[in-house]
Curated annotation (Swiss-Prot):
Signal peptide coordinates: 1-16
Other noteworthy facts: Present in outer membrane vesicle formulations which are used as vaccines in human.
Gene3D superfamilies the record matches: ABC-type transport auxiliary lipoprotein component
Keyword Lipoprotein: yes
Subcellular location: Cell membrane
Name this polypeptide is given: Putative lipoprotein NMB1124/NMB1162
Bilayer topology annotation: Lipid-anchor
GO CC annotation terms, alphabetical: plasma membrane
Pfam families xref list: GNA1162-like
Lineage of origin: Bacteria, Pseudomonadati, Pseudomonadota, Betaproteobacteria, Neisseriales
Lipid-binding residues (covalent, N-palmitoyl cysteine): C17
Chain residues carrying a lipid of type S-diacylglycerol cysteine: C17
Keywords: Cell membrane, Lipoprotein, Membrane, Palmitate, Signal
Length: 215
């Protein structure tokens, strides 16, 4: 009986690994395009938290820059859109990539949709979740170069004070996380998981990429 159980467990574990790992992304178009500069437009926010758009947007520059791309400064991009009468993320996403190229001179556009963002109370824990999906499009011809998604869930209850203490701690943590926008901190991890060239099916290394030297 024991060998049978162990064998079944091994099969289930193997099946789980096969389900969880996404197939390798086809980077043919990405390699042909060779983008050097990326314009990140304000993300669409499908979550109920109004901080979703700017929390995720503020987290994207670091991983993209470290990946070797020039990223247009968010403040400059926002002001340029305002001068062109565009202040809503949905309206900006509707602008043709070629038009954005005429305005900014960028090689590619990164479109992000935030599907989950914020902190929720779950029985004995307060959980902050950030989930997003993204598409990188060649702004010179509108061709999709890459797409991916990432989701991070982070709990904040490390209390050993029993059931009542855990309940109180979860409520307090949810309030504190909401006031300090814990989602922004978690979105940094989500952005790296989504955009880092070291992630499975992440964005390829750009022309300015510098390999970190071992110490």
């Amino acid at each position: 009986m024991k060998p049978l159980i162990l064998g079944l467990a091994a099969v289930l574990a193997l099946s789980a690994c096969q389900v969880q790992k996404a197939p390798d992304f086809d980077y043919t178009s990405f390699k042909e395009s060779k983008p050097a500069s990326i314009l990140v437009v304000p993300p669409l926010n499908e979550s109920p938290d109004v901080n979703g758009t700017w929390g995720v947007l503020a987290s994207t520059a670091a991983p993209l820059s470290e990946a070797g791309y020039y990223v247009f400064p968010a403040a400059v991009v926002e002001e340029t859109f305002k001068q062109n009468g565009l202040t809503n993320a949905a309206d900006i996403h509707a602008v043709r990539p070629e038009k954005l190229h005429q305005i900014f001179g960028n090689d590619a556009v990164l479109y992000i949709t935030v599907t989950e963002y914020g902190t929720s109370y779950q029985i004995l824990d307060s959980v902050t979740t950030v989930s997003a999906k993204a598409r990188l499009v060649d702004s010179r011809n509108g061709k999709e170069l890459w797409s991916g998604s990432a989701s991070i869930r982070e709990g904040s209850n490390n209390s050993n004070s029993g059931l009542l203490g855990a309940l109180v701690s979860a409520v307090v943590n949810q309030i504190a996380n909401s006031l300090t926008d814990r989602g922004y901190q978690v979105s940094k991890t989500a952005a790296y998981n989504l955009l880092s060239p070291y992630s499975h099916n992440g964005i390829l290394k750009g022309p300015r990429f510098v390999e970190e030297q071992p110490k």
